[in-house]
Amino acid sequence: MIKVIGVRFRRAGKVYYFNPLDMDITTGMHVIVETARGVEYGYVVLGVKDMDEEKVFQPLKPVIRIATP
């Protein structure tokens, strides 16, 4: 099992999974993450959850930090 969070970049967009590292991240928070398109700002729609490694595209990109208002 691997820990993941689900992040959206648009209101009704696809959910992307990221590695939360050791951060305490919950649903509703905003995060800065590393994506294939560079560093982006997203909204957490799925808090830290354990998932089977086969269901997640590896390697997961990390959360850089929790976004501040």
Task: Give, region by region, the residue ranges found by the protein language model.
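A generic structural motif
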Residues: 12-13, 36-39
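Short, structured beta-strand/loop micro-motifs enriched in basic residues and often containing a Trp
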Residues: 7-17
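Terminal, basic amphipathic appendages of nucleotide-handling enzymes
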Residues: 38-69
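Short aromatic-glycine-enriched beta-strand elements
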Residues: 2-6
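Short, well-ordered loop/turn sites that connect or cap secondary structure elements
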Residues: 24-25
